[in-house]
Amino acid sequence: MADTPKEGKLTRFLDFTQLIDLASECVGGKVLFATDDFFGPAENLIKSNNPSFKENEYTEFGKWVDGWETRRKRIPGHDWCVIQLGIQGIIRGIDVDISYFSGNYAPRMSIQAANLSEDTVTNIPPRGVKMGAAATSEEFVAITELKSHSWDYLVPMSELKPGDPDSSHNYFFVNSQQRWTHIRLNIFPDGGVARLRVYGTGQRDWAALDSTEPVDLVAIAFGGVCVGFSNAHFGHPNNMIGVGDPKSIADGWETARRLDRPPVLEGNENGFLQVPGCEWAVFRLAHPGVITQIEIDTKYFKGNSPDSCKVDGCILTTLEEEDMIRQKWSLPAHKWKPLLPVTKLTPNQNHLLDSLTLELQDVITHARITIAPDGGVSRLRLKGFPSSICLLRPLREKPMLRFSLKAGFRANL
């Protein structure tokens, strides 16, 4: 994730940087090919950490660099690499980060993309240690089968700014609703790039879903996304719906300490703190559906987990969602249906809970987690069944419920 905004305001500019990096090594991104890796291998492009600089560090090939840097080209052509996305999905925007590359950065670049089947890339040979080397003839022959030169352009040839602190990030919006699995980064003619961030939303094949097992309907890998929040001082809510287990306290949603907390805290007869305020985050599900299981993980939040939380759901059209974003989610209380009542949370622990879905009559499209008074949550999993499956099967051996879905909702299908 990029650096997060401090308060709950969704800006229209560079919103995509709060989405998941589909190419990151953390989610399974992989470099399949690079024409040249002389000063720095292309694998550096998809590292999850920010680039660094070591002033007096050298390798046998030259200055140590934290990025992909090719040799000064002395043959016809230009350099390029192919990356397999760790999460297949819709690309919303791209950040070509040139940090610490000033006299050696790539002056121009373009990005192409394709939607390939898994068996298409089986003949690509694995990459070994590539520093100081160029692609072999065998690798060129194998990658030619992908015909990557003819892939669709997401970003045409564009000039890049040098890697100075105030100009190292080169942002590009992507206007495409297609699903992509691979990208090709072209640099013209040679040089260095520190990081390539491919921001977007995951997209899964819901038709191929196993109808017998609940699925995490809010997972960012499938298309879930945060569409509003009250505070994200130390970590964006999208972190909660990330891939895999949390890696550290930075890999979660954490708010600032509320300034309206009482000078002396008191509890009620049920063991909950009596505090005036709370924090919240709203998510659009990857697919409308019914939530049957809720997982709330406070791992790594040992001295800063919330006292309690609750989860609610609602059903909104796309236009209603856009209106709520403008209104900072001032949705009338009666529109929210309880999925989880106010529940005490324990620090550094995963909480597995049943939802109140059996009481609901409608499929939900959005979910809201509310924490009191403040603090951090590392993971939120909302497991259940997509609406198409719910219509075909009973829920928990109960009589068939009536599900309805308002017209006008655009799911990530």
Curated annotation (Swiss-Prot):
SUPFAM superfamilies assigned to the protein according to its UniProt record, in alphabetical order: Galactose-binding domain-like
Biological processes, Gene Ontology terms: allantoin catabolic process
Gene Ontology terms for molecular function: allantoicase activity
InterPro entries listed in its UniProt record: Allantoicase (IPR005164), Allantoicase_dom (IPR015908), Galactose-bd-like_sf (IPR008979)
Top-level division of the source organism's lineage: Eukaryota
Record family assignment: Belongs to the allantoicase family.
General function of this protein: The function of this enzyme is unclear as allantoicase activity is not known to exist in mammals.
HAMAP family: Allantoicase
Name of the protein in question: Probable inactive allantoicase
Organism phylogeny: Eukaryota, Metazoa, Chordata, Craniata, Vertebrata
